A protein has these predicted regions:
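NAD(P)-dependent aldehyde/semialdehyde dehydrogenase
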Residues: 109, 118-233, 240-284
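Alpha-helical scaffold elements adjacent to nucleotide-binding pockets in ATP/GTP-utilizing enzyme cores
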Residues: 15-20, 67, 107, 145
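Short, conserved catalytic or adaptor-binding loops enriched in Gly and charged residues
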Residues: 26-30, 71-72, 202-203, 248-251
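Short phosphate-engaging motifs
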Residues: 12, 63-64, 87, 138, ...
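Conserved NAD(P)+-binding/catalytic subdomain of aldehyde/semialdehyde dehydrogenases
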Residues: 27-128, 133, 261, 269-286
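Conserved small-residue-rich beta-alpha loop and adjacent elements
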Residues: 1-24
Length: 286
C-alpha cells in the first residue's frame, strides 16, 4: 500500500501518520507492505507507481482524477475514483419547531460539525438546506441557535470573510434563482432560492455560506439530482421512506442518507462503492 500525501504540510497529516505508525507496528506484515510518501506534483513518479499498481484509489478533483487515469497501468488494474461531489441537508421545519431545547442543541452541534469544522470544503458537507414542511418560526429558531453556537466555536478568518462577501455579491448579480439574502453578521450568510435549477451543484458555499430552499416535495429535488450528488443529511425526516423514494426514482446520485452530524463518518461504503469488495481479489474453487 503506497499512499501519496499532499505536498503541503498540514499538522493533521502529521498527527494522523503518528497515530497510524503506533497502531501499524502491532501488525508487522501490514507495516512492511505500507508506505506513506510525499513528493511534488510529478507525473513521472506517479506513472512509476501506476505501472505496478493492482488498484489505484484516486481522491481529488475531476481534473486530478483524469490526469491519473491517463497514466498507463496494467490491464487488470482496478480504479476506484472519488471525484467532486455535492451534498445537502434535508430538514423538517415543523420538527425543528417542536424539538426540545436539548434536541435543538444537539442538532445544532451536529450541524456545526458537518459544516463549520471543515469550512464546508468536504464533499459530504451540505451546501444547501432544503426545508420540508417549511415553517418560518422553525427556520429562524434553527439559525438563531446555529449563530449562537458558532459564535462560541468558530474563528472566521479574514480571507474567508472576504471570499464570502465576494460570493454573495456575485450571487446577487448572476443567480437568477436568488430570492433573498440574509446576513446578520459575517458569520452566517443565507441565500434563499426561489426555485431549484439543474445547475444547483454549481452553487457552493464555504465558511458559513448556505443556500436554502422551501421544498414542495421530494420529487422536486429528484428532478435536479445528477451523479454528482453524494450525501443527504436529515433531521425530522423519515429516512427509510426517503431512501425508498430515492431507489424507486432510480437516481444517478445520492449515495448516502444519514442523520445530521454523520456527514463526515466515512466507512467501508463510500461514494456508492463497497471498498472491501472492490479492493479484494476473489479466488473461487469448484
Amino acid at each position: 500500500n503506497i499512499v501519496r500525501l499532499p505536498s503541503k504540510d498540514f499538522p493533521q497529516i502529521d498527527a494522523l501518520c503518528t497515530i497510524i505508525g503506533r497502531v501499524i507496528r502491532k501488525y508487522p506484515e501490514v507495516e512492511k507492505r505500507t508506505a506513506f510518501v510525499r513528493y511534488p506534483r510529478n507525473n513521472e513518479i506517479t506513472a512509476a507507481f501506476c505501472a505496478r499498481a493492482d488498484v489505484r484509489m484516486i481522491w481529488g478533483g475531476d481534473n486530478t482524477i483524469a490526469m491519473v487515469k491517463a497514466l498507463p497501468a496494467s490491464p487488470r488494474c482496478v480504479d476506484v475514483a472519488f471525484a467532486d461531489r455535492y451534498s445537502l441537508a434535508l430538514l423538517d421545519g415543523k420538527a425543528v419547531l417542536k424539538a426540545k431545547d436539548t434536541q435543538l442543541q444537539r442538532l445544532v452541534e451536529n450541524f456545526y460539525n458537518d459544516t463549520f469544522l471543515m469550512d464546508q470544503n468536504a464533499c459530504s458537507s451540505p451546501q444547501v438546506l432544503l426545508w420540508q414542511h417549511d415553517d418560518e418560526a422553525g427556520r429562524e429558531r434553527f439559525w438563531n441557535a446555529v449563530d449562537s453556537y458558532a459564535r462560541k466555536k468558530y474563528i472566521l478568518q479574514d480571507a474567508v470573510a472576504v471570499d464570502k462577501y465576494t460570493a454573495l455579491c456575485e450571487e446577487a448579480i448572476s443567480n437568477l434563482a436568488l430570492k433573498s439574502a440574509t446576513r446578520k453578521t459575517n458569520l452566517i450568510y443565507r441565500v434563499e432560492l426561489k426555485t431549484l435549477t439543474s445547475d444547483l451543484m454549481e452553487h457552493r458555499g464555504h465558511g458559513g455560506f448556505f443556500y436554502e430552499y422551501s421544498l414542495k416535495n421530494w420529487e422536486e429535488l429528484f428532478s435536479v439530482v445528477t451523479e454528482k450528488f453524494q450525501t443527504v443529511t436529515c433531521f425530522g425526516v423519515d429516512k427509510e421512506a426517503f431512501c425508498e423514494a430515492v431507489v424507486a426514482a432510480r437516481l444517478r446520485g445520492i449515495d448516502r442518507i444519514v442523520p445530521v452530524g454523520k456527514a463526515m463518518d466515512i466507512g467501508v461504503f463510500w461514494d456508492g462503492h463497497d471498498l472491501v469488495r472492490e479492493l479484494s481479489r476473489i479466488v473461487k474453487a469448484n
